[in-house]
């Protein structure tokens, strides 16, 4: 970034553009504001004067490019006239914060509103995920002589510090807000108006959500008004917020008055108008263009969304207006599932982000352009944007009338000004290309201006962008200061198209050159335009794709192959809904596997050791892809640390090998061992155990030259597990945590002495599997029995409630944590030990029945099961027992307790005991027309996996006090973060392998359906091990199998809780394509 004016007062620093726009605000390395801004963006930190005229309110920003700006060593001044007001604002800095001295004159009633966005964490943390950091900022509001004061504390430690800021005023504050959604409103995407600033009063409520922004409202002034807003920052506030700091007036009086030196005022070459929003589309247009609509979603008689026969998802603008989480899509090219590290991916958003975060391979590093940092489209330079220029006014294309997306393309339809403008972004199958095309249906000529914020790395502004322009073609290279250069030196992106001119920010204003990282492509007026970018990771660019329509068919067909040609038929619409789900969740499994990132969680790029061992592995297990499973096993084991036998929590699976998180939770070491048993049972590939693969050197984070057989890797890991058993037991130490990341121990004493009952159950299951399939099975059988014996001794000997944790301090009596007798946490029940102990067959029938009684009574809610019977106690964000569970100020994601991954494991446990409600439980977490199943479900995007179902409590205190409303279904539940999760893969695994019960071993097909009787006659097509199978499920008094009209002799598999699965030897299938009727037992439940 260039041209910044930095003001520094000891540890506090702020950077401005000469025209007065704030770039960033820091206390040491703590970024106080949320986004590093450029002068072309709407400013998040702002002061508005609001004219109250009758019933209407007119709002005017004071800190704008129209102001006359001056600087001195203490701050910046803004002066000017806006609407009916004359104003001056002086921003003064001191060593701990800032003051805004505001004076406004105007012949009417008005008030002032100050907006301050917050990052309140180390810069790298804030820029990794603004929404995540917002979830951990606690707001504390006090009311005193000057009205309301808002304190904000970062509850997640930043290098052992808890930064805080106090925002207030020296005059009366009568209203406030704590989250940007309470100011802008979801409709901002369509109107560009801050909806709640048009209301007489701010909401004056603490809303702990994902857009950290404090807003303050003054009392009304008549004709003349003065106020002083302030921000007072603290580097470390270990305790929860309490009484506010009072000596602000004294601090203010110590700032010396100095004249301001006038600064350069940026002169815009073009007027930037309000964005274009598509008009409401007509029913006749929809009927003509989308006559066949599947799973229509309606509200109050209006159509909101639907799917096409080809499974594309189509959304109306009216739905987008209501969502906090904007409609988005992660587009993929045709993924090479054996070599996923070169996948081309891009993110699109309905609100007019046509191509953002375009990556070739690594989603953090090999990134061509920037990603969206705000869900409301307030920041409009991210990624690739398109303006229409009319009479020297530039208008951005925003929310369309209709948006359509598939797995490799998105299309925006703008009904506007008597025309239909179509924008389409398409990724090609194999040639690493992205096309953006614009077309006018009426043949109208438009002058288009396309902006692209180039990063050639993780973040905008971080690295130099190196490019070469020749004959209108722009080629982008890794620069000398880029980490790409030594890892993927051949990486390039090449751009061409029908543009006439390539320029930069000077197209908007010459003073903005170098401020935003924009390339600006100007097109001559035409009724169509094309923009094309191609990536390469090796020496040569691929041959370009010519036929995009044929390309789309190739990619669509690849999903049929990926899902083993899976298809359901039934007279009800449930089959149709699940066919759609299989298609979209297969795509989202591929995102998790091949291009790890999400819509909200835009950073990623790595495989979590436990995550890849679940979502992708279980998907490929369910669909029978032995080659990918084998490669996955060897890849995961090659990342094992040679000295400890453990794994990193996560690692990059491409050439950025050294980037990984060394410390891992106590269960992580178990997952690679678990997949060994699963793979060997399915494949019979005992030869894999003799494959020689490297380790990772924990110091250098590189592969070792020395190799060990897979079996040696396995044995090393098992030795490590044994070494970590609590003294005198076969119970694994909790270490840094288990699957529930929010329950990491808060101190070293807990870490040392805790045992997770869930990890113990998983370990037992894994040892049992190894005993069945490894050469020295007796050893693992003995280990399993020892684990089972100690589980019974310590966990269930004197109670019928499995505790969430055991506290086992040497020399003291064992203590149950998360248990009805636990008076420390006051949490009674924990879900995942109850489900995993059944899945693993660790507990007997009586205990299994008790587990499900507990779940039904205490953990099951209308939108699914919750992780605990009560939330962890929250007291301002200070940890006592657990880290994030007691730190998160937002009641969402795992902290909100309905984490969908765990609900899917509940489905697995239901299938284990033969409970036919498993099918309904699949429906409860399906986003397609979810309100038909969960009446209190809030609207959400219908084609994306949501990782949690979040009860719409404003903050943790309301959640604690009113948690019973979740069970009642009397509070709305919102969809959480989307797409990036192991959830889509395990959902499809449970659908196919547990609920439909279709599994295989090396020499047999296994059928174990757990279906309600209303699905009698359900048909399923699937291809396993080169056998195309046409299956029909029929309920019966006894289970049996009929193949091509002939009843088969079958055996039952083992199941501790009920009659086991039907086993059909593959040798009995005499024809390649078989018609198989599975008669499933009506009453086969524990």
From Swiss-Prot:
GO biological process: carbohydrate metabolic process
Active site (record annotation): 741 (proton donor)
pH dependence as annotated: Optimum pH is 7.5-8.0.
S-S pairs: none
Enzyme Commission identifier(s): 2.4.1.333
Gene Ontology MF: a single term: glycosyltransferase activity
Leading EC class: transferase
Function text: Catalyzes the reversible phosphorolysis of beta-(1->2)-D-glucans. The minimum length of the substrate for the phosphorolytic reaction is 3 D-glucose units.
Family matches, as Gene3D superfamilies: 1.50.10.10
Name of the protein in its database record: 1,2-beta-oligoglucan phosphorylase
Family: Belongs to the glycosyl hydrolase 94 family.
Domain of life of the source: Bacteria
Keywords recorded for this protein, A-Z: Glycosyltransferase, Transferase
Lineage: Bacteria, Bacillati, Bacillota, Bacilli, Bacillales
Biophysicochemical property: temperature dependence: Optimum temperature is 37-45 degrees Celsius.
Keyword Transferase found: yes
Subunit structure: Monomer.
PANTHER family: CELLOBIONIC ACID PHOSPHORYLASE, CELLOBIONIC ACID PHOSPHORYLASE-RELATED
Pfam families documented for this protein: Glyco_hydro_36 (PF17167), SOGP_2nd (PF21250), SOGP_4th (PF21270), SOGP_N (PF21958)
Catalytic activity as recorded in UniProt: [(1->2)-beta-D-glucosyl](n) + phosphate = [(1->2)-beta-D-glucosyl](n-1) + alpha-D-glucose 1-phosphate
